């Protein structure tokens, strides 16, 4: 989210954010994932459907939008957290919503080892995220890797973010922004050298 904000500001364009803080079930999910997963996922699904509808109705000709989520992310989280019966119900709701999300011009996937992810989650300081378990982040990271291994709906830039901090380091951010702006079609990999090590 922080990186999406910076990119949108640099490009002077619309920003579409996941509004996790509005989800009344999310804090409970991190305490009790088994019992809170379904309402958490359904809330996010309805929120995304609303956001996409608003986006389509607002400025149809907005040249650039930056978002911190893909609609497909919802399904990935649902598969990871819901029981088989709950996932079936989620799928039925998803189909009924008939969400027609616009295809992105570019997807940026930041990859980092779980230890780095845990450190960054802790640094963000969001109270309910402090309950995130490393095991959950490992499963989530694996699910993202599998998802993006098959992803071919839009150009994809896979960034090794282990050694860079584009949110808090201006040189790292500029390096990444330059790479985003020069990204071509298809799948590309970016393995930057952190600025302070150069």
Task: Give the ranges of each region predicted by the language model.
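Glycine-rich phosphate-binding loop used to anchor ATP phosphates in small-molecule kinases
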Residues: 36-102
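Short, hinge-like loop/turn segments at secondary-structure boundaries
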Residues: 32-35, 84, 175-176
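NTP-dependent small-molecule kinase module
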Residues: 122-130, 136-198
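Hydrophobic/aromatic beta-strand patches that form the interior of the parallel beta-sheet core
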Residues: 16, 67, 106-108, 157-159
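Conserved nucleotide-binding/hydrolysis micro-motifs of P-loop NTPases
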Residues: 20-23, 71-73, 112-117, 163-166
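A glycine- and Lys/Arg-enriched "phosphate-lid" helix/loop adjacent to the NTP-binding pocket
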Residues: 74-145
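Walker A/P-loop
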Residues: 1
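Conserved substrate/cofactor phosphate-moiety recognition/catalytic segment
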Residues: 5, 9-47
